[in-house]
A protein has these predicted regions:
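Structural motif
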Residues: 2-3, 31-34, 73, 140-141, ...
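Conserved NTP-handling cores and scaffolds of large molecular machines
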Residues: 53, 255, 271, 372-375
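Short, glycine-/Ser/Thr-/acidic-enriched flexible segments
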Residues: 9-10, 39-40, 185-186, 201, ...
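A conserved active-site cap/scaffold subdomain adjacent to cofactor or substrate pockets
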Residues: 242-290, 295-297
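A conserved regulatory-domain signal marking ACT and ACT-like small-molecule sensing domains
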Residues: 285-417
Length: 417
Protein backbone atom coordinates (compact mmCIF):
# COMPACT_ATOMS: atom_id res chain seq x y z
CA UNK A 1 0.00 0.00 0.00
CA UNK A 2 1.54 3.27 -1.12
CA UNK A 3 2.10 6.46 0.81
CA UNK A 4 0.55 9.66 -0.52
CA UNK A 5 2.62 12.85 -0.34
CA UNK A 6 1.22 16.32 -0.85
CA UNK A 7 3.46 19.31 -1.55
CA UNK A 8 1.96 22.80 -1.47
CA UNK A 9 2.98 25.84 -3.50
CA UNK A 10 5.46 27.18 -0.93
CA UNK A 11 7.40 23.90 -1.01
CA UNK A 12 8.11 24.29 -4.76
CA UNK A 13 8.43 28.08 -5.03
CA UNK A 14 11.71 27.97 -6.98
CA UNK A 15 14.33 25.58 -8.36
CA UNK A 16 16.07 25.26 -4.98
CA UNK A 17 12.78 24.29 -3.32
CA UNK A 18 12.07 21.69 -6.02
CA UNK A 19 15.53 20.22 -5.40
CA UNK A 20 14.58 19.96 -1.72
CA UNK A 21 11.38 18.13 -2.73
CA UNK A 22 13.55 15.69 -4.69
CA UNK A 23 15.71 15.05 -1.62
CA UNK A 24 12.63 14.31 0.49
CA UNK A 25 11.17 11.94 -2.10
CA UNK A 26 14.51 10.16 -2.60
CA UNK A 27 14.74 9.47 1.14
CA UNK A 28 11.77 7.09 0.78
CA UNK A 29 12.48 3.81 -1.00
CA UNK A 30 8.85 2.82 -1.65
CA UNK A 31 6.55 3.86 -4.49
CA UNK A 32 4.65 7.07 -3.81
CA UNK A 33 1.65 9.04 -5.00
CA UNK A 34 2.94 12.63 -5.13
CA UNK A 35 0.22 15.30 -5.24
CA UNK A 36 1.47 18.79 -6.05
CA UNK A 37 -0.11 22.24 -5.97
CA UNK A 38 0.66 25.10 -8.32
CA UNK A 39 4.00 26.84 -7.75
CA UNK A 40 3.86 29.54 -5.06
CA UNK A 41 1.52 32.45 -5.98
CA UNK A 42 0.74 30.98 -9.42
CA UNK A 43 -2.92 30.40 -8.55
CA UNK A 44 -3.26 34.06 -7.53
CA UNK A 45 -1.58 35.14 -10.77
CA UNK A 46 -3.87 32.95 -12.87
CA UNK A 47 -6.87 34.34 -11.02
CA UNK A 48 -5.65 37.73 -12.25
CA UNK A 49 -5.58 36.30 -15.78
CA UNK A 50 -9.16 35.10 -15.31
CA UNK A 51 -10.36 38.48 -14.03
CA UNK A 52 -8.96 40.21 -17.12
CA UNK A 53 -10.44 37.48 -19.31
CA UNK A 54 -14.02 37.81 -18.02
CA UNK A 55 -13.75 41.60 -18.40
CA UNK A 56 -13.19 40.89 -22.11
CA UNK A 57 -9.64 42.23 -21.92
CA UNK A 58 -8.01 39.29 -23.71
CA UNK A 59 -4.83 41.26 -24.43
CA UNK A 60 -4.20 41.87 -20.72
CA UNK A 61 -5.13 38.27 -19.90
CA UNK A 62 -2.64 36.97 -22.47
CA UNK A 63 0.03 39.38 -21.21
CA UNK A 64 -0.39 38.15 -17.63
CA UNK A 65 -0.45 34.51 -18.76
CA UNK A 66 2.80 35.00 -20.67
CA UNK A 67 4.41 36.47 -17.55
CA UNK A 68 3.48 33.31 -15.62
CA UNK A 69 4.74 31.10 -18.47
CA UNK A 70 8.01 33.05 -18.51
CA UNK A 71 8.43 32.47 -14.76
CA UNK A 72 7.90 28.72 -15.20
CA UNK A 73 10.40 28.67 -18.06
CA UNK A 74 13.01 30.26 -15.80
CA UNK A 75 12.58 27.39 -13.32
CA UNK A 76 12.74 24.87 -16.17
CA UNK A 77 16.05 26.38 -17.30
CA UNK A 78 17.48 26.44 -13.78
CA UNK A 79 16.59 22.75 -13.31
CA UNK A 80 18.33 21.87 -16.58
CA UNK A 81 15.24 20.58 -18.38
CA UNK A 82 15.59 22.69 -21.56
CA UNK A 83 17.19 19.86 -23.52
CA UNK A 84 14.38 17.38 -22.83
CA UNK A 85 12.54 17.53 -26.16
CA UNK A 86 9.57 15.38 -25.10
CA UNK A 87 9.03 17.46 -21.97
CA UNK A 88 9.39 20.79 -23.72
CA UNK A 89 6.98 19.75 -26.49
CA UNK A 90 4.36 18.83 -23.88
CA UNK A 91 4.95 22.03 -21.91
CA UNK A 92 4.63 24.09 -25.10
CA UNK A 93 1.40 22.27 -25.96
CA UNK A 94 -0.05 23.20 -22.55
CA UNK A 95 0.97 26.86 -22.89
CA UNK A 96 -0.54 27.05 -26.37
CA UNK A 97 -3.76 25.52 -25.07
CA UNK A 98 -3.97 28.24 -22.40
CA UNK A 99 -3.19 31.09 -24.81
CA UNK A 100 -5.67 29.81 -27.42
CA UNK A 101 -8.38 29.60 -24.78
CA UNK A 102 -7.69 33.21 -23.79
CA UNK A 103 -7.58 34.38 -27.42
CA UNK A 104 -11.05 32.95 -28.06
CA UNK A 105 -12.60 35.38 -25.56
CA UNK A 106 -14.96 34.92 -22.60
CA UNK A 107 -17.36 32.01 -22.38
CA UNK A 108 -20.93 32.13 -21.09
CA UNK A 109 -19.95 30.46 -17.81
CA UNK A 110 -17.36 32.41 -15.80
CA UNK A 111 -16.91 29.52 -13.36
CA UNK A 112 -16.00 27.18 -16.23
CA UNK A 113 -13.42 29.73 -17.40
CA UNK A 114 -12.01 30.03 -13.88
CA UNK A 115 -11.50 26.28 -13.50
CA UNK A 116 -9.98 25.97 -16.97
CA UNK A 117 -7.52 28.86 -16.56
CA UNK A 118 -6.44 28.24 -12.97
CA UNK A 119 -5.88 24.50 -13.53
CA UNK A 120 -2.83 25.26 -15.68
CA UNK A 121 -0.89 26.12 -12.50
CA UNK A 122 -1.07 22.51 -11.33
CA UNK A 123 -0.50 21.12 -14.82
CA UNK A 124 2.68 23.19 -15.25
CA UNK A 125 4.11 22.42 -11.79
CA UNK A 126 3.53 18.66 -11.90
CA UNK A 127 4.97 18.31 -15.40
CA UNK A 128 8.12 20.15 -14.28
CA UNK A 129 8.49 18.07 -11.11
CA UNK A 130 7.81 14.73 -12.78
CA UNK A 131 10.38 15.48 -15.48
CA UNK A 132 12.96 16.70 -12.96
CA UNK A 133 12.57 13.57 -10.82
CA UNK A 134 13.10 11.43 -13.94
CA UNK A 135 16.20 13.45 -14.82
CA UNK A 136 17.56 12.80 -11.33
CA UNK A 137 16.95 9.06 -11.62
CA UNK A 138 13.52 8.43 -10.12
CA UNK A 139 11.20 6.60 -12.49
CA UNK A 140 7.69 8.00 -12.26
CA UNK A 141 4.61 8.64 -14.33
CA UNK A 142 2.89 12.01 -14.74
CA UNK A 143 -0.86 11.56 -14.71
CA UNK A 144 -3.65 14.05 -15.33
CA UNK A 145 -5.88 14.10 -12.24
CA UNK A 146 -8.83 15.09 -14.43
CA UNK A 147 -8.85 11.56 -15.87
CA UNK A 148 -9.21 10.13 -12.35
CA UNK A 149 -11.04 12.60 -10.08
CA UNK A 150 -14.65 12.57 -11.28
CA UNK A 151 -16.91 15.31 -9.97
CA UNK A 152 -20.30 16.98 -10.18
CA UNK A 153 -21.03 19.59 -12.83
CA UNK A 154 -20.46 22.65 -10.64
CA UNK A 155 -17.09 24.10 -11.58
CA UNK A 156 -16.11 25.62 -8.22
CA UNK A 157 -15.90 23.51 -5.06
CA UNK A 158 -17.18 20.58 -7.08
CA UNK A 159 -18.46 17.47 -5.32
CA UNK A 160 -16.51 14.24 -5.79
CA UNK A 161 -18.25 11.28 -7.40
CA UNK A 162 -16.64 8.72 -5.11
CA UNK A 163 -17.75 5.60 -6.94
CA UNK A 164 -16.56 6.77 -10.36
CA UNK A 165 -13.33 8.18 -8.90
CA UNK A 166 -12.59 4.97 -7.00
CA UNK A 167 -13.13 2.93 -10.16
CA UNK A 168 -10.85 5.14 -12.27
CA UNK A 169 -8.03 5.31 -9.71
CA UNK A 170 -7.97 1.57 -9.04
CA UNK A 171 -8.23 0.78 -12.75
CA UNK A 172 -5.32 3.10 -13.59
CA UNK A 173 -2.87 3.18 -10.68
CA UNK A 174 -0.22 0.46 -10.28
CA UNK A 175 0.92 0.67 -6.66
CA UNK A 176 4.41 -0.48 -7.62
CA UNK A 177 4.92 2.74 -9.60
CA UNK A 178 5.50 6.30 -8.36
CA UNK A 179 3.07 8.85 -9.80
CA UNK A 180 3.04 12.65 -9.88
CA UNK A 181 -0.38 14.26 -10.18
CA UNK A 182 -2.22 17.50 -9.53
CA UNK A 183 -4.10 18.62 -6.48
CA UNK A 184 -7.22 20.80 -6.61
CA UNK A 185 -8.57 19.76 -10.03
CA UNK A 186 -10.93 17.16 -11.44
CA UNK A 187 -13.39 16.81 -14.31
CA UNK A 188 -17.13 16.34 -14.74
CA UNK A 189 -18.85 13.75 -16.92
CA UNK A 190 -18.37 15.99 -19.97
CA UNK A 191 -14.61 16.07 -19.37
CA UNK A 192 -14.71 19.75 -18.42
CA UNK A 193 -12.21 20.90 -15.80
CA UNK A 194 -13.60 21.42 -12.30
CA UNK A 195 -11.95 22.53 -9.06
CA UNK A 196 -12.30 21.29 -5.48
CA UNK A 197 -11.97 24.71 -3.82
CA UNK A 198 -8.96 26.79 -2.82
CA UNK A 199 -6.42 24.74 -0.85
CA UNK A 200 -8.12 21.61 -2.21
CA UNK A 201 -4.86 19.74 -2.87
CA UNK A 202 -4.94 18.27 0.66
CA UNK A 203 -8.35 16.87 -0.21
CA UNK A 204 -6.97 15.39 -3.44
CA UNK A 205 -4.32 13.53 -1.43
CA UNK A 206 -7.03 12.14 0.85
CA UNK A 207 -9.10 11.04 -2.17
CA UNK A 208 -6.18 9.05 -3.60
CA UNK A 209 -5.42 7.53 -0.19
CA UNK A 210 -9.05 6.50 0.38
CA UNK A 211 -9.33 4.89 -3.04
CA UNK A 212 -6.02 3.03 -2.77
CA UNK A 213 -6.21 2.10 0.91
CA UNK A 214 -2.86 3.83 1.48
CA UNK A 215 -0.99 3.37 4.74
CA UNK A 216 -0.30 7.10 5.31
CA UNK A 217 -0.77 10.60 3.93
CA UNK A 218 2.00 13.14 4.56
CA UNK A 219 1.35 16.83 3.92
CA UNK A 220 4.62 18.76 3.64
CA UNK A 221 4.28 22.33 4.95
CA UNK A 222 6.46 25.31 5.82
CA UNK A 223 5.65 24.85 9.54
CA UNK A 224 6.76 22.13 11.96
CA UNK A 225 3.31 20.58 12.15
CA UNK A 226 -0.23 21.46 13.11
CA UNK A 227 0.11 24.52 15.33
CA UNK A 228 -2.30 25.52 18.06
CA UNK A 229 -2.39 29.08 16.65
CA UNK A 230 -1.27 31.08 13.63
CA UNK A 231 2.14 32.65 14.42
CA UNK A 232 1.15 35.66 12.28
CA UNK A 233 -1.28 36.66 15.03
CA UNK A 234 -0.14 34.93 18.22
CA UNK A 235 3.13 34.39 20.09
CA UNK A 236 4.38 31.20 21.75
CA UNK A 237 2.59 28.78 19.45
CA UNK A 238 2.86 25.04 20.09
CA UNK A 239 2.88 22.02 17.79
CA UNK A 240 0.00 19.60 18.37
CA UNK A 241 2.05 16.41 18.26
CA UNK A 242 -0.85 13.97 18.11
CA UNK A 243 -4.57 14.62 17.80
CA UNK A 244 -7.61 12.54 16.96
CA UNK A 245 -9.55 12.65 13.70
CA UNK A 246 -12.45 14.15 15.67
CA UNK A 247 -10.37 17.03 17.00
CA UNK A 248 -8.81 17.65 13.58
CA UNK A 249 -12.28 17.84 12.00
CA UNK A 250 -13.38 20.29 14.70
CA UNK A 251 -10.32 22.49 14.15
CA UNK A 252 -10.62 22.48 10.35
CA UNK A 253 -14.36 23.23 10.58
CA UNK A 254 -13.67 26.12 12.94
CA UNK A 255 -11.21 27.56 10.42
CA UNK A 256 -7.74 26.13 11.13
CA UNK A 257 -5.86 26.76 7.89
CA UNK A 258 -3.24 23.98 7.94
CA UNK A 259 -5.66 21.21 6.89
CA UNK A 260 -8.34 21.52 4.22
CA UNK A 261 -11.68 20.87 5.94
CA UNK A 262 -12.71 18.02 3.61
CA UNK A 263 -9.44 16.11 4.08
CA UNK A 264 -10.07 14.32 7.36
CA UNK A 265 -13.33 12.45 6.75
CA UNK A 266 -12.14 10.02 4.01
CA UNK A 267 -8.99 9.28 6.03
CA UNK A 268 -10.99 8.62 9.18
CA UNK A 269 -13.37 6.37 7.26
CA UNK A 270 -10.50 3.99 6.42
CA UNK A 271 -8.34 4.72 9.48
CA UNK A 272 -5.48 6.16 7.38
CA UNK A 273 -3.03 8.22 9.48
CA UNK A 274 -2.26 11.79 8.41
CA UNK A 275 1.08 13.44 9.15
CA UNK A 276 1.84 17.15 8.81
CA UNK A 277 5.60 17.53 8.37
CA UNK A 278 7.99 20.40 7.66
CA UNK A 279 9.75 20.41 4.29
CA UNK A 280 12.34 22.70 5.93
CA UNK A 281 13.03 20.76 9.14
CA UNK A 282 12.65 17.28 7.67
CA UNK A 283 14.00 15.54 10.78
CA UNK A 284 11.12 16.94 12.82
CA UNK A 285 8.37 14.35 13.32
CA UNK A 286 5.64 16.97 12.94
CA UNK A 287 2.02 16.26 13.84
CA UNK A 288 0.03 13.07 13.57
CA UNK A 289 -3.73 12.79 13.08
CA UNK A 290 -5.04 9.31 13.80
CA UNK A 291 -7.51 7.30 15.86
CA UNK A 292 -6.33 7.90 19.42
CA UNK A 293 -7.80 8.13 22.89
CA UNK A 294 -7.76 11.82 23.66
CA UNK A 295 -5.97 13.05 26.76
CA UNK A 296 -8.05 14.87 29.35
CA UNK A 297 -5.38 17.59 29.37
CA UNK A 298 -5.85 19.29 26.00
CA UNK A 299 -3.83 22.10 24.46
CA UNK A 300 -5.77 25.30 23.85
CA UNK A 301 -6.02 26.21 20.15
CA UNK A 302 -6.63 29.73 18.82
CA UNK A 303 -8.12 30.23 15.36
CA UNK A 304 -8.26 33.79 14.03
CA UNK A 305 -10.12 34.61 10.82
CA UNK A 306 -9.84 38.29 9.79
CA UNK A 307 -11.90 40.20 7.21
CA UNK A 308 -15.23 38.52 7.84
CA UNK A 309 -18.69 40.06 7.48
CA UNK A 310 -21.38 40.06 10.18
CA UNK A 311 -25.00 40.09 8.95
CA UNK A 312 -28.04 40.58 11.20
CA UNK A 313 -31.32 39.72 9.49
CA UNK A 314 -34.84 40.31 10.84
CA UNK A 315 -38.37 40.17 9.48
CA UNK A 316 -40.07 43.38 8.38
CA UNK A 317 -43.17 42.84 10.55
CA UNK A 318 -41.27 41.87 13.72
CA UNK A 319 -42.57 38.31 13.55
CA UNK A 320 -40.45 35.47 14.90
CA UNK A 321 -37.62 33.98 12.82
CA UNK A 322 -38.80 30.46 11.97
CA UNK A 323 -37.28 27.53 10.08
CA UNK A 324 -38.80 28.62 6.77
CA UNK A 325 -37.08 32.01 7.08
CA UNK A 326 -33.71 30.39 7.80
CA UNK A 327 -34.18 27.98 4.90
CA UNK A 328 -34.86 30.87 2.52
CA UNK A 329 -31.91 32.87 3.88
CA UNK A 330 -29.50 29.95 3.43
CA UNK A 331 -30.74 29.40 -0.09
CA UNK A 332 -29.71 32.99 -0.85
CA UNK A 333 -26.35 32.47 0.88
CA UNK A 334 -25.70 29.41 -1.27
CA UNK A 335 -26.71 31.16 -4.49
CA UNK A 336 -24.53 34.23 -3.92
CA UNK A 337 -21.61 32.53 -2.20
CA UNK A 338 -21.45 33.44 1.49
CA UNK A 339 -19.38 30.92 3.48
CA UNK A 340 -20.88 30.86 6.96
CA UNK A 341 -18.51 30.40 9.90
CA UNK A 342 -20.82 31.28 12.81
CA UNK A 343 -24.58 31.54 13.37
CA UNK A 344 -26.71 32.96 16.17
CA UNK A 345 -30.43 33.52 16.35
CA UNK A 346 -32.91 35.17 18.69
CA UNK A 347 -36.68 35.43 18.50
CA UNK A 348 -36.59 38.34 16.06
CA UNK A 349 -33.22 38.17 14.31
CA UNK A 350 -30.75 35.78 12.74
CA UNK A 351 -27.05 36.70 12.68
CA UNK A 352 -24.25 35.07 10.72
CA UNK A 353 -20.54 35.70 10.42
CA UNK A 354 -18.81 34.55 7.26
CA UNK A 355 -16.66 35.44 4.31
CA UNK A 356 -17.68 36.85 0.92
CA UNK A 357 -16.18 39.22 -1.65
CA UNK A 358 -17.07 42.92 -1.42
CA UNK A 359 -18.86 42.77 -4.78
CA UNK A 360 -20.93 39.73 -3.77
CA UNK A 361 -21.72 41.27 -0.36
CA UNK A 362 -23.59 44.15 -2.00
CA UNK A 363 -25.53 41.69 -4.18
CA UNK A 364 -26.30 39.54 -1.12
CA UNK A 365 -27.59 42.46 0.96
CA UNK A 366 -29.77 43.70 -1.92
CA UNK A 367 -31.26 40.22 -2.36
CA UNK A 368 -31.97 39.79 1.36
CA UNK A 369 -33.51 43.27 1.63
CA UNK A 370 -36.33 42.23 -0.70
CA UNK A 371 -37.94 40.40 2.24
CA UNK A 372 -35.92 41.29 5.35
CA UNK A 373 -34.36 44.12 7.31
CA UNK A 374 -30.58 43.72 7.01
CA UNK A 375 -27.77 45.29 9.01
CA UNK A 376 -24.14 44.39 8.45
CA UNK A 377 -20.59 45.07 9.59
CA UNK A 378 -17.73 44.36 7.22
CA UNK A 379 -14.09 43.79 8.16
CA UNK A 380 -14.92 42.03 11.41
CA UNK A 381 -12.70 39.31 12.86
CA UNK A 382 -13.66 35.87 14.14
CA UNK A 383 -11.69 34.42 17.06
CA UNK A 384 -12.28 30.81 18.11
CA UNK A 385 -10.69 29.38 21.26
CA UNK A 386 -10.86 25.58 21.35
CA UNK A 387 -10.30 23.78 24.68
CA UNK A 388 -10.30 27.11 26.51
CA UNK A 389 -9.05 27.34 30.08
CA UNK A 390 -10.50 30.78 30.78
CA UNK A 391 -12.63 33.38 29.00
CA UNK A 392 -9.84 35.89 28.45
CA UNK A 393 -9.25 37.28 24.97
CA UNK A 394 -5.52 37.23 24.06
CA UNK A 395 -3.72 40.50 24.84
CA UNK A 396 -3.01 41.16 21.15
CA UNK A 397 -6.79 41.44 20.50
CA UNK A 398 -7.89 43.20 23.70
CA UNK A 399 -8.52 46.53 21.96
CA UNK A 400 -11.23 45.08 19.71
CA UNK A 401 -14.93 45.41 20.54
CA UNK A 402 -16.89 42.19 21.12
CA UNK A 403 -19.94 42.08 18.83
CA UNK A 404 -20.94 38.45 19.47
CA UNK A 405 -19.80 35.88 22.02
CA UNK A 406 -20.72 32.18 21.90
CA UNK A 407 -19.70 29.50 24.37
CA UNK A 408 -20.04 25.72 24.49
CA UNK A 409 -18.33 23.10 26.68
CA UNK A 410 -15.09 23.07 24.70
CA UNK A 411 -15.21 26.15 22.49
CA UNK A 412 -15.69 29.89 22.85
CA UNK A 413 -16.06 32.17 19.84
CA UNK A 414 -15.94 35.95 19.47
CA UNK A 415 -16.86 38.25 16.61
CA UNK A 416 -14.60 41.28 17.05
CA UNK A 417 -14.39 44.71 15.44
Amino acid sequence: MSKVFKFGGASIKNAKAITNLKNIVFSYKESLIIIVSAIDKTTNELEGVWRSFIKKDSNDAIKKANESIKFHKSIIEELGLNSDYEFFSFFKKLTQELLLFLSAGPKENDDLSYSKIVSFGELFSTLIISTYLKKEGLKNEWIDARTLIKTSNQFLESKVNWEATNNEINRTIDQNITYVSQGFIGANQMGETTTLGREGSDFTAAIFAWCLGSNEVIIWKDVDGLLNADPKYFNNTKVLKSISYKEAIELSYLGASVIHQNTIKPLENKNIPLSIRSFINTNNSGSSVREIVESKEKITSLIYKPNQVLLSISTRDYSFIFEEHISEIFSIFSKIGLKVHLMQNSALSFSVCGIISNKSLLILVAELQKNYIVKYNDKVNLLTIRNFKNLDIPKSLKDQEILIQQRSRATIRYVLK
